[in-house]
Amino acid sequence: DGFECNVLQERQCIEAMQCMAKLHMAMRHLQTQQPYQADRLLEDFKRKDAELVRARNFMRRLSRKDEFTLMFLRAYERYWQQTKLAQSFLDAACLQALERKQLTEEMYVHGDMNQHNIIMLQGKVMTFRNFEKLGAHLQMKDVYFFMRKILEKNHWSVALADQMIESYAAITPVEHA
């Protein structure tokens, strides 16, 4: 019997990152029945932008606005500007280079990497479950989702973040993910 990765046990989180790095190495150039189809990163950014605009427009049209809606609308512009600034750093050429890298290395991701899908067996050995969202993407996507979940629960510990990245990078250099 196994148990889920405990987000408050730093050692388990670090070991989970090592296992994720090994999984990512194994998930490159998988032999599948379907041709490899990389995500289009530029299209993904545009889709996320459109979702944010739709959410804002929906909330603007509400006749009765609760406290959360009012706070969201007040904060929206500031976050929207930060989104645009972040996107300006990732110009089209940079994103196209990432897409080429993804296609060349045929990277796959778990797609739903969180503590609930990382199972500890006999203390240290781990396995992963729930691969329903497995797909072609930059593997940093899994790293991001897992780290965000863990760091939220650990008060955004910079020391833990450093250890997690170092443990992943010891197996799969971050620039290759």
Task: Label the model's feature ranges.
Residues 1-35:
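ATP-binding pocket architecture of kinase catalytic cores
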Residues 21-24, 64, 79, 100, ...:
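Gram-positive cell-envelope targeting signals
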Residues 140-173:
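Active-site activation/catalytic loop segments of kinase-like enzymes and analogous catalytic loops
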Residues 7-15, 135, 152-156:
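Short alpha-helix boundary/capping segments
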